[in-house]
A protein has these predicted regions:
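Low-complexity, Ser/Thr/Pro/Gly-enriched N-terminal "stalk/linker" regions
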Residues: 3-56
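Alpha-helical solenoid scaffolds in large eukaryotic transport, assembly, and signaling factors
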Residues: 26, 30-43, 60-91
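Solvent-exposed loop and edge beta-strand segments that line ligand/cofactor-binding
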Residues: 8-13, 49-65, 105-122, 163-176, ...
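Basic/polar, acidic-poor N-terminal "presequence/leader" segments
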Residues: 37-50, 96-111, 146, 161, ...
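Extended, well-ordered alpha-helical scaffold segments
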Residues: 12-23, 82-98, 137-160, 192-210, ...
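Long, repeat-rich segments with strong aromatic
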Residues: 187-331
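Well-ordered alpha-helical scaffold segments within catalytic/enzyme domains
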Residues: 4-11, 68-81, 122-138, 179-191, ...
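Extended ligand-binding groove/face enriched in aromatic
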Residues: 65, 74-187
């Protein structure tokens, strides 16, 4: 598995501390909040913390989950992090058996089978994978506490994927390739062979014959590149020679820096607009994907240098803007960290 956090990684302490401080400022900030919530009756009209005793902050549930992923990752890759004691105290206070039971109880109510599908599902599994990587008493304790929720989303993936006739190729939360990439990472770390086999089978069925990608992007509120996340996703389940042959068909003109749109960082006209601010996320997620893709080509392949150059341009375009307005501040550092830690 070739995910960015599957290997030891280096990050400058100042950057790690900046990202940690950002996440700590919002993971327990309850408001403003955009709920993904079906009311089954009048008694379901409750504040976020009553609905989600663990993941109630960061504007929305999925951003809160990956805010915890960011903090858990920094705790592992930056051992001298100044914020480490605050992070441990946060996890001890929030990732508890009682809190997780409340999250599972929410899922078990009627009309909530599609809650956070597939984006929030995938990020919860990424958090679970990261906690497993710690190999510490803390990590084992948090992994055990989170396990019922982890198991619930593994079960949802296992039930849903065989029923899904088509992938979703949008550049937003619904993108299937992104969810499969993160689910694949969890399956690898947790040695969940049934999930790994299912993810690989769905990727082959949905993307294996794709060729001549036109890359009709960006969309106005994209934060993922449908083209690049598909390439990144396929690299997780195909052996390198097979993946390279697939890439020759999928994006045959990369050596000529085509499609041109994949090499041009997007502009962001209004960072106070939550949808337009997604475009900073697109630059950061493209940087992550380009770096991950580059690592799968041999050092003498000219596409490796081309991909790394594209990654640096995209990272430089949006890294300065992970803070400044809460529209982006509640989530962008996660994608910056993915990019920074990718080889």
């Amino acid at each position: 598995m070739n995910g960015p956090s599957s290997r030891p990684a280096a990050i400058e302490m100042a950057t790690a501390s900046r990202f940690a401080s950002l996440a700590l400022s919002h993971v327990t900030r309850e408001f403003p909040n955009k709920l993904d919530h079906v009311l089954n009756g009048p008694d379901d009209a409750k504040r976020p913390r009553a609905l989600h005793p663990v993941f109630y902050g960061s504007m929305d549930w999925h951003s809160n989950v990956h805010g915890y992923w960011l903090l858990a990752t920094l705790l592992r890759v930056a051992p001298g992090l100044p914020e480490r004691d605050r992070i441990r105290a946060l996890f001890d206070g929030q990732i508890t058996a009682a809190g997780v039971a409340g999250e599972v109880a929410y899922l078990d109510q009627p009309n909530r089978g599609t809650f956070e599908r597939p984006y929030g599902w995938a990020w919860l599994l990424m958090l679970a994978a990261e906690l497993r990587r710690h190999g510490t008493d803390d990590g084992r304790r948090w992994t055990a506490a989170l396990a019922p929720l982890t198991d619930a989303f593994v079960a949802r993936f296992t039930t849903f994927l065989p029923r899904a006739a088509y992938p979703i190729r949008a550049g937003t939360h619904f993108n299937t390739a992104f969810a499969l990439a993160l689910a694949s990472e969890y399956a690898h770390v947790a040695s969940d062979e049934p999930l790994a086999e299912l993810v690989g089978r769905m990727e082959a069925a949905w993307y294996g014959e794709d060729a001549g990608c036109q890359a009709w992007e960006p969309g106005g509120d994209d934060f993922l590149s449908p083209a690049l996340i598909e390439a990144e996703c396929m690299g997780r389940v195909l052996e390198h020679p097979v993946w390279r042959a697939w890439m020759d068909r999928f994006l045959p003109r990369l050596v000529d820096r085509q499609p041109e749109t994949l090499f041009a960082p997007v502009s962001v006209s209004d960072r106070s607009d939550g949808k337009i601010a997604h475009l900073d996320g697109l630059n950061l997620s493209r940087a992550w994907c380009w770096r991950s893709i580059a690592a799968r080509w041999s050092p003498d392949d000219p596409r490796r240098a081309i991909a790394l150059e594209a990654a640096e341009r995209h990272l430089a375009a949006s890294l300065p803007y992970v803070a400044g307005d809460y529209a982006g501040e509640h989530w962008l550092a996660t994608y910056a960290l993915l990019a920074v830690l990718s080889p």
